[in-house]
A protein has these predicted regions:
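Short amphipathic alpha-helix used as the core "switch/output" element in two-component signaling
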Residues: 67-80
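Active-site residues of response regulator receiver
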Residues: 57-58
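Acidic, metal-coordinating helix/loop segments flanking the phosphotransfer/catalytic sites
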Residues: 33-53
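Acidic catalytic/metal-coordinating carboxylates
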Residues: 36, 64-69
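Charged docking surfaces used in two-component/phosphorelay signaling
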Residues: 18-26
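Conserved acidic carboxylate
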Residues: 11
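C-terminal output helix
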Residues: 108-121, 125-126
Length: 128
C-alpha cells in the first residue's frame, strides 16, 4: 500500500467524502481525507512532499474554500495536480482555473474522478 500515490481530498460532506474515498481506493490511490480547508492546509504543510494530488471541493464550510486550499498547494509546488469539484456553475473556473487542473461538476461518476487524477499525474510525469 505504501507505493500507492497519496491524494489529499478536502470535502466537508461526509457522503461525498465516502464516494470519493471509495473511488480513489478502487482506482489504486491512497486517499487522505480533510473535512475542512484549514485541516487540508495543515496536512499539506506538514507533509509537503507526501501528496501527489489534491481533490478539492470548491465550496467548503468554514473560512477557507477549495480555491484557497489549492492556492496553498501551489505555493508548495506550482505544478501541483488539482481536481476541483463543484455543484455550482463553472462560471468562476476561468478566473481561478490554473494549469495542471481539472474541474468536475457534481454529480459525476466515480470513474470520472479516477480518470481525472490519473490524467493529471500522467501529464505531470511526462513533463518531468
Amino acid at each position: 500500500m505504501a507505493d500507492q500515490p497519496v491524494v489529499l481530498v478536502v470535502e466537508d460532506d461526509q457522503g461525498i467524502q465516502s464516494i470519493v474515498e471509495d473511488a480513489l481506493v478502487e482506482g489504486g490511490f491512497e486517499p487522505a481525507i480533510a473535512p475542512s480547508g484549514e485541516e487540508a492546509v495543515t496536512l499539506l504543510r506538514g507533509n509537503r512532499n507526501g501528496y501527489r494530488a489534491l481533490v478539492a471541493d470548491v465550496k467548503l464550510r468554514g473560512r477557507m474554500d477549495g480555491w484557497e486550499v489549492a492556492r496553498h498547494a501551489r505555493e508548495i509546488d506550482p505544478e501541483f495536480p488539482i481536481v476541483y469539484m463543484t455543484g455550482a456553475s463553472a462560471d468562476q473556473w476561468p478566473a481561478h482555473g490554473v494549469p495542471n487542473s481539472i474541474l468536475l461538476q457534481k454529480p459525476f461518476a466515480p470513474a470520472q474522478l479516477v480518470t481525472a487524477v490519473s490524467q493529471l499525474l500522467i501529464n505531470r510525469t511526462t513533463k518531468a
